[in-house]
Amino acid sequence: LYESERQQVLLGDDIDFMTDYMKLEKLCNPEFNFEVNILNEVRYIQVPPLLFMPVIEYVIRTTVCGENGKGENIRIDFQMEENQLRFICTYCLRKKESLQVAPAFDKLRQRLDLLYPGGYQLKSGYNDEALCTIGLMLEL
């Protein structure tokens, strides 16, 4: 949290913070499961602090367990391709009606507009099984 006062932090530090946050959630809800995948070497990329936390917080509030209460609730992928950082979060919705733009996403879009004017894409969607994906692509 001390690093949130800085303009930029290492993505690896932010990933560690998100992982700790989800581990804390798992202590409160033992059926909650998550997976974080880091493709390519993204840990040393500089990003604004806590940039991805609004997505994580929203997803934790809206997920359900896999079949029979077991399985992965959230999967997070970080990948660098050329000069584009990709953050993809996949999770199950409680119900399809839950897929609404959260107020936190409005604030996230405002922040992204200031930090990456015209240099980002924030998308979300779901399939028939209520599996939802939120993707954030940043031009670095």
Where are these regions (language model features)?
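Two-component histidine phosphotransfer core
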Residues: L1-K123, C132
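C-terminal beta-strand of the catalytic ATP-binding
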Residues: Y91, G135-L140
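A short beta-turn/loop motif at secondary-structure boundaries
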Residues: Y126-D128
